[in-house]
Amino acid sequence: MSPQTETKAGVGFKAGVKEYKLTYYTPEYETKDTDILAAFRVTPQPGVPPEERGAAVAAESSTGTWTTVWTDGLTSLDRYKGRCYHIEPVPGEEEQFIAYVAYPLDLFEEGSVTNMFTSIVGNVFGFKALRALRLEDLRIPVAYVKTFQGPPHGIQVERDKLNKYGRPLLGCTIKPKLGLSAKNYGRAVYECLRGGLDFTKDDENVNSQPFMRWRDRFLFCAEAIYKSQAETGEIKGHYLNATAGTCEEMIKRAVFARELGVPIVMHDYLTGGFTANTSLSHYCRDNGLLLHIHRAMHAVIDRQKNHGMHFRVLAKALRMSGGDHVHSGTVVGKLEGERDITLGFVDLLRDDYIEKDRSRGVYFTQDWVSLPGVLPVASRGIHVWHMPALTEIFGDDSVLQFGGGTLGHPWGNAPGAVANRVALEACVKARNEGRDLAVEGGEIIREACKWSP
């Protein structure tokens, strides 16, 4: 061993276990514009000081391990370590606190959501010194944002492609989600689109099953799109789910969709994975396809209030990885959602610059610079009587995605789609005339019923 690499016991190195807070708790640290900042909700084991547990989170999600190692002396820990720089109690929760951690940007590969999450949440959530841990928010610095392509096209480009302005877009998920033949599936798509919807959608678990192979579904849906476009004079689309068992197969399906000339494909970004999603997003940008994102499996990650990851973090990650639409909850439908919190991450999806606002769950000011925005998709358990609230809450830059609220119409799919479109246009017209949708919404819908099925 050369003199330059030889390490002797007792010379600059002392083996053994020491408290994390001695190295990783730095309340005097001033965060840098280039740091990735994280807010963790920590529930420690009894008797452990918050400073030690906050420092443990910073250590185990960056450079630390359970003991001092001699290779620590071969690098600069002060340059690369995560730092717990602030701790605050959670109101109403005696055993929880928020630990703020700063990570140097050099810890992360450029343009890789996969690497970012592997570092920040990949290991520390199984740490036995913690009873529970939840990542509430991330601040992504501009320097890191600029390494991502982001959404394939964004809100304005999508509107230009569709030639549709001044209102939310309307969609419908085809039901039953499983069991239809490709031909019957295409018929259902056609009926919805000719009735007035902008989009129809594959359900998240429609891939390529024995009862309906993907290529057959793509062909019959493309036929439905072109036929409904010819009848209505509007541009239509169907979210063709390209999610597959391999990235190669996924791209093959997207290529076929492009060859058919349809405007949009779909991906289940959590079950498919961020690497696959980013690859598909790049393909869609290069080939003029819009990309609809479904968040299947999100509740496994974000449902618990004290463990896992809040959806606002997944929403930020999706904007970085790439998608033109993403499901965001409804506030008024059958799934969980708090209005202010939901609107907080809706703003994080759509806006260029979002100020810190703890009442809306936004822990950090976020600057997206030139990264395109993502349309939030309100879906699950909604129907025409929710239209006034949805129009008021989500505004024009959104997709209102019905299912049973269209297909459950007693006269069939096309009349259900007509009812959706009439209700939406009535609400938009009333809003533009200055009427209060929150107060007069029911009356507006009743008036619209006079000229709608």
UniProtKB/Swiss-Prot annotation:
Keywords: Acetylation, Calvin cycle, Carbon dioxide fixation, Chloroplast, Disulfide bond, Lyase, Magnesium, Metal-binding, Methylation, Monooxygenase, Oxidoreductase, Photorespiration, Photosynthesis, Plastid. Transmembrane segments: none annotated. GO terms for biological process: photorespiration; reductive pentose-phosphate cycle. The disulfide bond which can form in the large chain dimeric partners within the hexadecamer appears to be associated with oxidative stress and protein turnover. GO terms for molecular function: magnesium ion binding; monooxygenase activity; ribulose-bisphosphate carboxylase activity. Its EC number is 4.1.1.39. The modification N6,N6,N6-trimethyllysine is found at residue 14. It is found in: Plastid, Chloroplast. Substrate binds at residues 123, 173, 177, 295, 327, 379. Pfam families: RuBisCO_large (PF00016), RuBisCO_large_N (PF02788). It is an enzyme of class 4 (lyase). The record marks 334 as: Transition state stabilizer. The keyword GTP-binding does not apply. Mg(2+) binds at residues 201, 203-204. Belongs to the RuBisCO large chain family. Type I subfamily. The basic functional RuBisCO is composed of a large chain homodimer in a 'head-to-tail' conformation. In form I RuBisCO this homodimer is arranged in a barrel-like tetramer with the small subunits forming a tetrameric 'cap' on each end of the 'barrel'. NCBIfam families: PRK04208.1. This is Ribulose bisphosphate carboxylase large chain.
